[in-house]
Design a protein with these regions (language model features):
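Glycine-/small-residue-enriched transmembrane alpha-helix faces in small-molecule transporters
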Residues: 1-46, 156-183, 203
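Helix-helix packing/entry segments at the starts of transmembrane helices
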Residues: 19, 46, 92, 106-113, ...
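Transmembrane alpha-helical core positions of polytopic small-molecule transporters
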Residues: 22-23, 83-92, 115, 149, ...
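Membrane-interface helix termini and inter-helical loops of multi-pass transporters
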Residues: 27-39, 67-69, 97-100, 149-160, ...
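Transmembrane alpha-helices of multi-pass small-molecule transport proteins
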Residues: 36-90, 117-121, 172-180, 194-212, ...
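C-terminal-most transmembrane helix of multi-pass membrane proteins
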Residues: 48, 149-151, 222, 257-303
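C-terminal transmembrane-helix exit sites in multi-pass transporters
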Residues: 54, 114-139, 262-281
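Specific transmembrane alpha-helical segments of multi-pass solute transporters/efflux pumps
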Residues: 62-105, 147, 230-248
Length: 303
């Protein structure tokens, strides 16, 4: 195994780990919505503000005044703002908004259209044509996500116009979130890039849904869930997701992000009594196999 292939293996592992973390926190988020009736805007503001503050403080402790380097070049202002709003904010906010307008199954399926957007982006911007096998793996993984989210019952989908729009915006947010930050991460480092991105996204989100306007009563469990979602499911997950994109292509990362509904299903089997049937096993296979084959294909291309 050469150096490039080792990078692809590491990138695949990072991608899987970020998906697993998001799956865990997705279950916590659903519990939070159900038991505390919080809005999608509030939970987005909370997690981005807390996570961004933590990452930026950590970055300042490590880099001192260099943490401000991003802002010393005025050419960075507009592209970085685009990353914060079109990427970080959109992928969080529009997913939860889609859940509110429809349900979790519909939101999950629509968000996983992101690999298709990345294929189009690569074609339009880089004139890079995807291989037939890559397109096939993306479609198979999408089928697996659809089967897992609906359990084979398409009547569970709630495809209202608002759900379709917010779901597609969430998918575009995934695309921007894995593509736009890369120049900044390479030049200034992953930690300050993620930290500043979350702070800006959090400020924007607070304009829409101020985090200080509570619609529920804080207790020990709600505080604990907020901290886990913010620090573990947002700061840490975003960081390793960006690290993954530095090692493998954005397309591979977006396909491997299907491990999020996979991890949610596995946790539901272990802790919530979800019954394992043939539709669930088939969905798992349709999700896992494209991840493996797409990573192997990229490893072969790096030889």
């Amino acid at each position: 195994m050469n150096q490039y292939q080792k990078k692809i293996v590491k990138g695949t592992i990072y991608s899987l780990l970020s998906g697993l973390i998001w799956g865990i926190c997705g279950i916590l988020g659903e519990y939070f919505f159900t038991h505390y009736q919080v809005s999608s805007g509030w939970i987005t503001s909370m997690r981005l503000t807390l996570a961004g503050s933590l990452v930026l403080i950590w970055s300042a402790m490590q880099l001192k005044s260099q943490v401000l380097d991003i802002w010393r070049d005025k050419k960075n202002y507009l592209p970085f703002l685009a990353y914060a709003i079109l990427g970080i904010f959109s992928v969080q906010y529009f997913f939860y908004l889609c859940v509110e307008y429809s349900n979790a199954a519909t939101a999950t399926i629509l968000q996983f259209i992101s690999p298709v957007f990345i294929l189009f982006y690569n074609r339009l911007v880089y004139q890079k044509r995807a291989s037939k096998s890559a397109i096939f793996y993306v479609l198979v993984a999408m089928l697996g996500v659809c089967l897992m989210a609906t359990k084979g019952d398409l009547s569970q989908l709630s495809m209202t116009p608002l759900a379709l729009v917010t779901g597609l915006l969430s998918a575009m947010g995934v695309m921007f979130n894995v593509i736009l930050p890369q120049p900044f991460a390479k030049r200034y480092g992953f930690v300050p890039t993620v930290g500043w991105g979350m702070i800006l996204a959090g400020l924007f989100s607070n304009v829409l849904s101020p985090v200080y306007q509570l619609s529920f009563t804080l207790d020990i469990w709600s505080i604990l869930i907020c901290l886990i979602i913010a620090f573990f499911g947002t700061a840490f997950a975003f960081f390793i997701s960006m690290k993954a994109v530095s090692l493998v292509s954005p397309l591979v990362v977006s396909v491997i992000s299907a491990s999020e509904p996979l991890s949610s299903a596995l946790l539901s089997v272990l802790f919530l009594g979800l019954v394992v049937d043939w539709s669930l096993l088939t969905a798992m296979a349709l999700i896992i196999l494209p991840m493996i084959f797409l990573s192997v294909e990229e490893a072969k291309e790096s030889k």
